[in-house]
């Protein structure tokens, strides 16, 4: 049985990934998997109406919401994480952060990464490759995750998205068989 990762990403960052602008996802932790591994993109639910509107065609941005409405609360695609890079921002001078230098591939400035990770703390840049966008987004319960239960540890249908990321069984694996053998 091969593991993959379900990663929760806010709508505005999913849009940048789908546009090809964001090729490095910054996280505080990383999975205990050898690269390359598959990641499923869960687009989180929006905080405001229409915040999860993701443009799939240029013309859609002038006529929303419509058929191009795509997003929150669903798995919208997948990618292969082929490299995980260590990321660490250290700053002793606030003036150095004022320039707001963007870290390549992240769509984030060094200041934003510093605020997210903390001064001198290491994070990880998950490199996005082989991006596939689903024609029809998938519900979270169509994926299977590992969970502790009354009957012990086993693989079960997901009923909620992970806070950051979590392990799932890749599509094509027999989830029912693994539940019986867990």
Q: What are these regions, as identified by a protein language model?
A:
Residues 1-182:
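Structured alpha/beta reader/binder surfaces that contact nucleic acids or chromatin modification marks
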């Amino acid at each position: 049985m091969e593991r993959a990762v379900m990663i929760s990403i806010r709508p505005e960052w999913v849009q940048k990934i789908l546009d090809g602008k964001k090729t490095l996802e910054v996280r505080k932790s990383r999975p205990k998997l050898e690269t390359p591994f598959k990641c499923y993109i869960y687009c989180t639910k929006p905080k405001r109406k229409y915040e999860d509107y993701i443009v799939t065609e240029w013309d859609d941005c002038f006529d929303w919401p419509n058929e191009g409405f795509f997003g929150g609360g669903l798995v919208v695609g997948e990618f292969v994480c082929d490299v995980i890079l260590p990321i660490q921002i250290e700053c002793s001078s606030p003036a150095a952060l004022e320039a707001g230098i963007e870290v390549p591939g992240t769509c984030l400035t060094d200041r934003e990464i510093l605020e997210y990770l903390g001064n001198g703390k290491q994070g990880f840049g998950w490199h996005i490759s082989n991006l596939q966008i689903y024609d029809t987004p998938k519900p979270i319960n169509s994926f299977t995750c590992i969970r502790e239960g009354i009957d012990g540890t086993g693989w079960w249908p997901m009923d909620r998205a992970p806070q950051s990321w979590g392990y799932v069984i890749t599509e094509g694996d027999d989830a029912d068989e693994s539940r019986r053998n867990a």
